[in-house]
Every structure is written in structure tokens, then in C-alpha cells.
């Protein structure tokens, strides 16, 4: 058993989890966000989004100043009070966005893979794809250690593309809407473990952890959590964990922020 009164960290995916996949609404989760904030429980956002996007969302959600995990773990934005840590304000893992872009351009030109990256289009096009405002769409292009793309080729070619990326030290990861290319060594799980270790070092006690996610790219994060909420999502593959002990893992009946609230209700309301 655990409660929000003990040292606790909550790690949360965004699109399809804390945010509605289509409207980006988060209001159903607002009461729990307020309760966690009042209990001094950090809610650490963890997403494929850029750090620029996530810093904007932190302010919207009342989570400013906390650490966050961007670009599927390739970027860690440090907490405001962690200024003494090397790399402040951000730690970037592995290959840079520019280097990945060069690799992708070479593969497209020489091996004729079909895809469109966010670097190929303007913010107006991204607005059409996502429903975001123009100003928010511009933030989606500020990648530091990954590339986001739409795949426009066959499944067979995707397998070949993935293999080529792996040979070059990169990974190809599916998100809620788009695909992402990043360093093979990066991941939400590694980033979360680093943040957990930092909190433990600063407080002298390892915090209990709860993670929430809805897609296959959230599985590594949820695997390293003490407790996990798998929010019902739109992805046909779903989320599958090695340890799905019902005492540790809760699968919601609701989607998006309604499911996020359901997961928190399950683990805490009776405690």
C-alpha cells in the first residue's frame, strides 16, 4: 500500500493519457493535479514532445519548475532547483537532432524510403496534422535529439528502414500519432530512472513511483515504475508489460484524462 503522503513521484505521458488525443483537453484530471500539487507530489511529464512544447504545457497544467522528460527520453529538463547539476538546464542524450536529420536525408535519397518529417513542412502544415495553434505547432519543430515523421511506405519497407536505423545506432519508435527516430541508447525508462535516482540522492530516500501511459512507447517507462496505470488508448497494439500483477497495474475503462483520473482514483481514493 502507498499514499500521497509518503515520498512519491508521478510520471505521466501526455497525448492520449493526461491530454485528450483529439482536443488536448485535460480538465477531467484537474482535481487530481491540484491535490497532488497541494501534497507536494511532483508530476513529471514524459512524452515524445519537444522540451519547448512541454515547458509551455507545464505552465498550463500548473507544473512549472518540475523536471520533465522530452523526446521519448532523449532530453531531460532539470528541475529549477537543480542548478548545481552538470548540464543544467537540460541533459541531452546521444545523437543530436541535426545528426539524425542528416542520416534520414541520406537514407531517403539513396534508398528511397518514403516519409515526411516535421522538418520538411511548415507550422501551418503541422497545425493541419495536429489541430494545434500555429504558435504551438512551431514549438513541435524545436527538436534537440530526435526527429518526428509520418511514415508513407509499406510495412515491409518499414522493417528494412528500422533495421538500417538500428545498424546506425538509432531506434524507430511509434507514438500516439507519429513515428520518432532517436538514439538507440535513449528511452523514457532510462530518463525516469535518472530522475528517481536524483530525487533519492537529494532526499536520502527512494520515492515510490507511479506511471501513467497509453501507448507502446510508454511500456519501458511503466516497466520501471512501482505502480502503473495503462490508460485505455487508440493504439491497436496496446500496452503489454512483463509484470501485470493487478496489485501493481491498473487498466482503465476510460480514455485520456478521464482514464488518468480513474487510475489515480483506483490507487489513492481508498487509501
UniProtKB/Swiss-Prot annotation:
The keyword Aminoacyl-tRNA synthetase does not apply. Keywords: Cytoplasm, Hydrolase, Magnesium, Metal-binding. The active site is at residue 13. NCBIfam families: HAD-SF-IIB, HAD-SF-IIB-MPGP, MPGP_rel, PRK03669.1. Its main location: cytoplasm. Transmembrane segments: none annotated. It comes from Shigella dysenteriae serotype 1 (strain Sd197). One of its GO terms (cellular component) is cytosol. The gene is yedP. It comes from the Bacteria. InterPro entries: HAD-like_sf, HAD-SF-IIB-MPGP, HAD-SF_hydro_IIB, HAD_sf, MPG_Pase. This is Mannosyl-3-phosphoglycerate phosphatase.
Amino acid at each position: 500500500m502507498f499514499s500521497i503522503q509518503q515520498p512519491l513521484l508521478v510520471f505521466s505521458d501526455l497525448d492520449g493519457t493526461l491530454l485528450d488525443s483529439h482536443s488536448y483537453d485535460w480538465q477531467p484530471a484537474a482535481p487530481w493535479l491540484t491535490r497532488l500539487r497541494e501534497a507536494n507530489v511532483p508530476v513529471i511529464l514524459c512524452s515524445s514532445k519537444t522540451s519547448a512544447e512541454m515547458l509551455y504545457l507545464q505552465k498550463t497544467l500548473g507544473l512549472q519548475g518540475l523536471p520533465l522528460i522530452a523526446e521519448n527520453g532523449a532530453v531531460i529538463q532539470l528541475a529549477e532547483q537543480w542548478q548545481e547539476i552538470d548540464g543544467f538546464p537540460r541533459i541531452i542524450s546521444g545523437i543530436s537532432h541535426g545528426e539524425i536529420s542528416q542520416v534520414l536525408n541520406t537514407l531517403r535519397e539513396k534508398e528511397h524510403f518514403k516519409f515526411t518529417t516535421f522538418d520538411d513542412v511548415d507550422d501551418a502544415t503541422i497545425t493541419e496534422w495536429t489541430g494545434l495553434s500555429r504558435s504551438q505547432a512551431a514549438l513541435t519543430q524545436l527538436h534537440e535529439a530526435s526527429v518526428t515523421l509520418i511514415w508513407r511506405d509499406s510495412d515491409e519497407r518499414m522493417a528494412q528502414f528500422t533495421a538500417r536505423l538500428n545498424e546506425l545506432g538509432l531506434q524507430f519508435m511509434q507514438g500516439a500519432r507519429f513515428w520518432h527516430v532517436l538514439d538507440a541508447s535513449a528511452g523514457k525508462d532510462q530518463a525516469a530512472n535518472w530522475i528517481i535516482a536524483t530525487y533519492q540522492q537529494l532526499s536520502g530516500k527512494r520515492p515510490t513511483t507511479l506511471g501513467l501511459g497509453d501507448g507502446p512507447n510508454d511500456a519501458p517507462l511503466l516497466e520501471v515504475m512501482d505502480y502503473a496505470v495503462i490508460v485505455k488508448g487508440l493504439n491497436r497494439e496496446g500496452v503489454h508489460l512483463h509484470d501485470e500483477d493487478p496489485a501493481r497495474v491498473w487498466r482503465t475503462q476510460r480514455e485520456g484524462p478521464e482514464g488518468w483520473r480513474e487510475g489515480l482514483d483506483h490507487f489513492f481514493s481508498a487509501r
